[in-house]
Curated annotation (Swiss-Prot):
Pfam families the UniProt entry points to: Histidinol_dh (PF00815)
GO cellular component terms attached to this protein's record: cytosol
Alphabetical UniProt keywords: Amino-acid biosynthesis, Histidine biosynthesis, Metal-binding, NAD, Oxidoreductase, Zinc
Protein name (Swiss-Prot/TrEMBL): Histidinol dehydrogenase
A molecular function GO annotation: zinc ion binding
Residues at the catalytic site: E340 (proton acceptor), H341 (proton acceptor)
Sequence positions that bind NAD(+): Y142, Q204, N227
Function noted in UniProt: Catalyzes the sequential NAD-dependent oxidations of L-histidinol to L-histidinaldehyde and then to L-histidine.
Species for this entry: Prochlorococcus marinus (strain MIT 9313)
Enzyme Commission number(s) from the entry: 1.1.1.23
Family according to the record: Belongs to the histidinol dehydrogenase family.
GO biological process: L-histidine biosynthetic process
Binding-site list for substrate: S250, Q272, H275, H341, D374, E428, H433
Cofactor(s) the protein requires to work: Zn(2+)
Length: 442
């Protein structure tokens, strides 16, 4: 093991390390899944709790003071004027406008199919039993800033809320030191019909949405990814408001066999690693020759790369190649990791896809790079990370909906079930439960 705790590489490259041993592979995948935890999270949580308390007690003034401290400008006003949104769209190049419009249409088209239907059934004694869906009234969406601008995330969060029927949608995103939010992000907000935009980032933005201030409305649900402080803030306010998920750093896992082209594999791993130094890029392959060729292709594609240092940090710390004896073993290891994004660069991808139990999104075949899912395929790109695909899924229309049970008994239905209700109530020692049934027949 190296001082950093990584397994020694079986390839000559120090850029990404390779293992063959089954148990070592599982240990490495577990290390990658836990890459966002540790002492830094405990320290950050103390800061987050202080920020939440300050915003709750001081409102707008806290937002201004905290933004000046952390982001280097005074957000006065806190809100972006509608004219700024319109201006951002007008100044967006035509080709980019067209690309955003295409993405918006495709995301809308897919999410329209996610609307659940109300349910009403009749029981055996004539009772009516149902489930009714209704949207939350207010939702807040957080759009990260920092290393890159994410107009696609605006669309991916706004569309399901709109399809759900949310009445009021509030967007918040960190601004630069000049006080301006990225123009393309504002253009995407304009396209999506968002009218309330805040120049706020970090835990203070989440606090504002969760508690409300003089300017910021208190919302019912908060969605959207962010850095560690944003994620911890969402975790802390959950229960006061609903949240979509606790997003960690992004990841991709590629399963490849002899049919895969090594240059495509390299490009897809780099497409993930360029996000963040904490992004994880994993290759599971049955082909030792593919694993051996990969480092040189990564190096070649990194030459002149505008985000080379981020890619190198990601791959050297959180990159992994595992040589497996079979595709079945690849699928088992993938399920153990439960990746956010799973690419299947294999000869018979549907056979593998059918075996997969845990993945945020599966990209099937050589013509489906993760990038199409990130931008405009249609399914949501806000996905579970760091192993949470074992028990959760993508952001969806249902994130912004609540379902209410509907129950209507008539006299005969209550008569037919009254003895059982009273018996169950008595077994739990709840006298008035039983009495509430009996008294109806006096």
């Amino acid at each position: 093991m190296t001082q950093s705790g990584q397994a020694e590489s079986e390839t000559p490259s120090t850029l990404i390390h390779c293992v063959r041993d089954r148990q070592q592979a599982k240990r490495e995948l577990e290390r990658l899944a836990n890459r966002s935890t540790g002492n830094s999270q405990k320290q950050a949580m103390a800061t987050v709790e202080d920020i939440l308390d300050t915003v709750r007690s001081q409102g707008d003034q806290a937002l201004i003071t905290l933004t000046e401290r952390f982001d280097g400008f005074r957000p006065e006003p806190l809100t972006v004027a509608p004219e700024e949104l319109e201006d951002a769209w007008r100044k967006t190049p035509q080709k980019l406008q067209s690309a955003l419009e295409l993405a918006y249409r495709r995301i809308q088209d897919f999410h329209q199919h996610q609307r659940p239907n109300d349910l009403m059934v009749q029981g055996i004694h004539g009772e009516q039993l149902g489930r009714r869906w209704r949207p939350v009234q207010k939702a807040g969406i957080y759009i990260p800033g920092g290393r890159a601008a994410y107009p696609s995330t605006v669309l991916m969060n706004a569309v399901p809320a709109q399809v759900a029927g949310v009445e009021q949608l509030v967007m918040t995103s960190p601004a630069g030191r000049d006080g301006q939010i990225n123009r393309t992000v504002l253009a995407a907000a304009h396209l999506a019909g968002i009218r309330e935009v805040l120049r706020l980032g970090g835990a203070q933005a989440i606090a504002a949405l969760a508690f409300g201030t003089e300017t910021v409305p208190k919302v019912d649900v908060i969605s959207g990814p962010g850095n560690l402080y944003v994620t911890l803030a969402k975790k802390a306010v959950y229960g006061q408001v609903g949240i979509d998920s606790l997003a960690g750093p992004s990841e991709v896992l590629v399963i490849a066999d002899q049919s895969a082209r090594v240059e495509q594999v390299a490009a897809d791993l780099l497409a993930q690693s360029e996000h963040d130094p904490l992004a994880a890029a994993v290759l599971l392959t049955t082909e030792a020759s593919l694993a051996e060729q990969l480092p040189s292709h990564l190096e070649a594609q990194l030459k002149g790369h505008p985000r080379e240092q981020i890619c190198r940090a990601s791959l050297s710390n959180w990159g992994l190649v595992v040589i497996c004896e079979s595709l079945e073993r690849c699928a088992q290891l993938s399920d153990h990791f439960a990746p956010e994004h799973l690419e299947l660069l294999v000869e018979h991808p549907h056979a593998i896809a059918d075996c997969i139990k845990n993945a945020g999104a599966i990209f099937i075949g050589p013509w489906t790079p993760e990038a199409v899912g990130d931008y405009l395929a249609g399914p949501n790109h806000t996905l579970p990370t760091c192993g949470t695909a074992r028990f959760s899924g993508a952001l969806s229309v249902e994130t912004f909906l609540r379902h209410t049970s509907l129950i209507e008994f008539n006299r005969s239905a209550l008569e037919a079930t009254a003895n059982a209700v009273r018996e169950l109530a008595s077994s739990e020692g709840l006298h008035s439960h039983a009495e509430s049934v009996r008294i109806r027949f006096e």
